[in-house]
Every structure is written in structure tokens, then in C-alpha cells.
Amino acid sequence: MAEGGSSEEELRAIVHNLGVSPFFLGTFDKRFPGFISSQRMACAIVNTAGRETGGVHWLAMAWNPRSKTFYMFDPFGFSDSKLKQVYSFEYEGLLRRSAIASSPDRCVTLAKSNETIQGPNSAACGLFCCMFLHAFVNWPDDPFDHNPTMGPLKSVPNYKLNDPTVQYVLWGNQEKLYKFLEKHSAYFRAHAAAIKARTAFNKLKQ
């Protein structure tokens, strides 16, 4: 992200603090080559745009080889068609490029977040991705919910993303996100004021 949002360096530092590093392949733009090993648990943070644009929106992707599940986490919970429409981003090709698609039985489960936890004008997508990856490495069989990291967040149907009546719920999620990072990330604590300013709930309106 350029003026608002999170830089790649920032996300890598926070991910390291959260204990994700042993499984973390890195931050990538939309040209992410996919997961290179079908036998190893792995994850990444991927932007929907090319690096040359400065970035647009962060997603998290993760692979659990035990259950053969490919997780795609989008804090907005956009549908496949909406991701393509809004960002011209398609993950099907990415999935095909991954080594996991060439596993012997080619039986891969795609699990995708389909509800919204982030406000429409928030620039905290990268931070939410870090939070999700913490859940993934600790509870790889159910990282979206039913765990102490993501469980406290409240989701709303994606079609209500801009509904004024749910903004307090989404604002509350961002406050919980900041508190989580304050507790678990030394990098976040050291740069909290600047990070909060760049990822503010109303940042895209400023």
C-alpha cells in the first residue's frame, strides 16, 4: 500500500513477532507463484495488484497439507466474481500454478472467508491478514473461527459492507485487532501511532 495501509516490511516484521515465520513464504504481489511444496504447511500475504502500483488490497493464503486445504482469507469477504470485478484478481490460476494442484490425487479443498470483518474505508487489511495467519499456524484445521485469535471478531454478510447499521461492529473488530497486536507484536507496540494513522478505520475517506 502506498500512502495508507501496511508496507511489506511492516507486515513481515509483525508476522515474525506472531511466530508465523517458520511457515511464512513472504509478501507477494498478484504474481505470487503459489505454494511450491504440497507436503509442507505454508502461508503468504498476497496483494491483489502488481508491486509497481504500490499495492491495493492484501489477502492471506495458507496451505494445510494434513487436510489438503487451501485457505484464502479476505477481510472484506468478497466473492470470487467480486475480487475479479474490483481488483481484476483471480486466484484460480494461482491455485493451478501451485504444487498442491499436482498432488497425486489432486483433491484439494478450497476454504474461503465469505463474510466481512473490515470496514469499507479501513486500510487495515494487511494487519487483519497477519492476525489470520497467527490463527492458521496455531489452529490450522479451523483458522477462520472457533479459536482464541479470530473467534472474538464479529463478521457481517458482505452485502452489508457499507450498511451504516453494522459499522460499529466492524469498528469494534479493528479495535480488537489493534489490541491483539499490542499484546503480541513488539514491532506494532513500537510504531503503534504511525501504524494506526495509516490503517485507520476511515482512512480511505481521508
UniProtKB/Swiss-Prot annotation:
SUPFAM superfamilies to which the protein is assigned, alphabetical: Cysteine proteinases
Enzyme class: hydrolase
The keyword DNA damage appears for this protein: no
Any matching Pfam family: Peptidase_C5
MF terms (GO), sorted A to Z: cysteine-type endopeptidase activity; DNA binding
GO BP term, example: proteolysis
Regulation: Requires DNA and protease cofactor for maximal activation. Inside nascent virions, becomes partially activated by binding to the viral DNA, allowing it to cleave the cofactor that binds to the protease and fully activates it. Actin, like the viral protease cofactor, seems to act as a cofactor in the cleavage of cytokeratin 18 and of actin itself.
Active site: H57, D74, C125
Highest rank taxon of the organism: Viruses
GO CC field: host cell nucleus; virion component
Note: All late proteins expressed from the major late promoter are produced by alternative splicing and alternative polyadenylation of the same gene giving rise to non-overlapping ORFs. A leader sequence is present in the N-terminus of all these mRNAs and is recognized by the viral shutoff protein to provide expression although conventional translation via ribosome scanning from the cap has been shut off in the host cell.
The protein's role, per its UniProt record: Cleaves viral precursor proteins (pTP, pIIIa, pVI, pVII, pVIII, and pX) inside newly assembled particles giving rise to mature virions. Protease complexed to its cofactor slides along the viral DNA to specifically locate and cleave the viral precursors. Mature virions have a weakened organization compared to the unmature virions, thereby facilitating subsequent uncoating. Without maturation, the particle lacks infectivity and is unable to uncoat. Late in adenovirus infection, in the cytoplasm, may participate in the cytoskeleton destruction. Cleaves host cell cytoskeletal keratins K7 and K18.
Protein name: Protease
Organism: Canine adenovirus serotype 2 (strain Toronto A 26-61) (CAdV-2)
